[in-house]
Amino acid sequence: MPSRLSPPDIPPLQPTPTVSDGHHRFQTLPLIIAGSLTLTGVLLILVTLLIYRRLYRNRTAPSDLISNSKSPQHYQCRRFSYSQLRRATNSFSESTHLGHGGFGSVYKADFPSGGDSLAVKVMDTSAGSLQGEREFHNELSLSSHLIGSPHVVSLLGFSSDRRGRKLILVYELMANRSLQDALLDRKCVELMDWNKRFEIATDIAKGIEFLHHCCDPIIIHGDIKPSNILLDSDFKAKIGDFGLARVKSEDFDTRILIEEEDKSKDVVEDNGSILEETESVITVFEEGNNVVNLSPETCGISVLTETVASPGEKSGLSPENCAVSILTVEVGAASPAMASIPSPETCAISVLTDTGLSPESSKLKVGSKRDWWWKQDNNGGSRGGIESGSVKDYVMEWIGSEIKKERPSNNKEWINNGDGSSSVSKKKKKEKKRKPREWWKEEFCEELTRKKRKKKKKKKRGLSSISSIDSWFHRDDGASSVHDHNLNPTKRKKRNSIDWWVDGLSGELKSVMGKKNSQDSGLWCDVNVQKSGGVSSTPSMRGTVCYIAPECGGGGVLSEKCDVYSFGVLLLVLVSGRRPLQVTASPMSEFERANLISWAKQLACNGKLLELVDKSIHSLEKEQAVLCITIALLCLQRSPVKRPTMKEIVEMLSGVSEPPHLPFEFSPSPPMGFPFKSRKKAR
């Protein structure tokens, strides 16, 4: 039987793809793309939030604090969370409120975990002002320099609330609050002990000494006052509130302080001012060359001729025969013939003439900084030396015209003996001085009448007592002196007994009034004389009224001597237990003591310093009290150069150095050799 071949295996047929499967794949592709895009967007949002959070933290904390956060000096200054501080202060309730500063409120924060209590200062930034934020950053930047002193309040941390723009600083808690609250408001019994007050004064001095002599760079506090002096549980004083403090730069020197000294000198600005004041040429005869060269401050201008011919010869003097020189004059001349040369106060133009000088020997001697007008169009010239060459024709013509105006018709009358010429020069000098004085007096009287009219208008409008105090500050010293001169002696004496205390405050702030008259109206309107007599800080100036030094008022440059001045006022407040300006409805005797600084100066002149001491103090050490008042008066001197340094003050208080003496102007018995020369001429 024939075999059958098996049929070959046929692979199964693949089903053809249908239209429904392709449509399903087309639907899943957009879902995958949408999911990936959503995930990418979420990741971008998270990264953006992280970057924003980092940038916000960098804006809250200063850059130098962040960059140096790894240094051991910054380990104490930590960042607190806002929620943690809010729980510790019971949501900043009134029960934990300790006080209110210039730009923030202070609360007590209790931490249950550590058991410690801290002080939390919430900076006020809701008013739209950046001052609170500036103080916040300023204190953070200075925190690294203030570590290591027991006399400075330590900054422990900071925090910020992004939503409410709350900037918070965390300090160590000072149980007895500020010196102003303990001494002037609550009048703590512990401060009635003199030893405790003296210890507080020493602690404050050591704290300022740490800022000036131990910190590198030097820190200037700028706002030393009782409200910024904090007391711990043992009444140990510490300096706080460094919101207005500044770091002294390396290139800062005392040139500004020296300029204050130079302002008191009588310096001739230019030749034009000399001509306007004198309006005369004084002729003086001299037989020798007794010309004394002194400092440039005592410069006068003279036309000088040397004696060549014999005294018996008589010859005409022409302007071309005169040599021009810058002549320096001393008040006490070297020879009797120089006695008639005008003093620097008169700044006259002297013509010292004689015969026999040729025009070729004319020389221009430049010896002063104020010789610019001699060197016009003369290519600068050689400063400080003798300059050869011809002098400009218009200069010689001017000199000749001035000499011809005053030359007598007869030469015999002009060339006379020395005594006669000196007497003639004195008479001319007096006569020529009358016109400027009369002109000045007329203008001054007009100004006085204008002021009287303004005062009458103010009285009619019924201004408040604050505006009357403001008028005391704006009172002109010259006007008051002329008005007092017109009064009889009895009325003038009664008036001085009431107004002397105002002179101290207005005198200390006179430099501020002179520098910025246009801005001072707004500045002085900010001075709030409260019922308690306290004076508040003003945002337009650095410091506090009555505590700020006169040279740094109106936005001036701060220096260590500004803190010294403020310490002097603070020392008087601590000794007397009174505010620097305390106006109350008391008898007239108390009203005269309203200005503490003027009262202290008056008592020093009368030799009654102990009357300044607080009557409620017991166990008083009189020597220490006199020492404190003397140091305070040394600190309150107008010239910053004359004030002592804080290192010297600490040595005085600790007894290392000898007790200081009162300043000369406050001494009750001035010595015989009075340095100021009387302006009255001997007859």
Swiss-Prot record:
The stretches that face the Extracellular side, renumbered to this chain, are 1-30
Its principal location?
membrane
Top EC class, one word: transferase
Q: How does it sit in the membrane?
A: Single-pass membrane protein
Record's keyword annotation contains Kinase: yes
Q: Which reaction does it catalyse?
A: L-seryl-[protein] + ATP = O-phospho-L-seryl-[protein] + ADP + H(+); L-threonyl-[protein] + ATP = O-phospho-L-threonyl-[protein] + ADP + H(+)
Q: What UniProt keywords are attached to this protein's entry?
A: ATP-binding, Cell membrane, Kinase, Membrane, Nucleotide-binding, Receptor, Serine/threonine-protein kinase, Transferase, Transmembrane, Transmembrane helix
Q: Which residues bind ATP?
A: L98, G99, H100, G101, G102, F103, G104, S105, V106, K121
GO terms (molecular function) for this protein are: ATP binding; protein serine kinase activity; protein serine/threonine kinase activity
Q: Which stretches of sequence are listed as region Disordered?
A: 1-21, 406-436
Q: Which InterPro entries match?
A: At4g25390-like, Kinase-like_dom_sf, Prot_kinase_dom, Protein_kinase_ATP_BS, Ser/Thr_kinase_AS
Q: Which GO terms describe its cellular component?
A: plasma membrane
Signal sequence segment = none
- The positions flagged as active site in the entry are D223
**Which residues face the membrane's Cytoplasmic side?**
52-683
| Record-linked Pfam families | Pkinase (PF00069)
Q: Which residues form a coiled coil?
A: none
Q: Where is the composition biased (Polar residues)?
A: 411-424
Name the domain of life this protein comes from.
Eukaryota
Q: Where is this protein localized, as stated in its record?
A: Cell membrane
Write out the biased-composition intervals (Basic residues): 425-436
What is stated as this protein's family in its record?
Answer: Belongs to the protein kinase superfamily. Ser/Thr protein kinase family.
Name of the featured protein: Receptor-like serine/threonine-protein kinase At2g45590
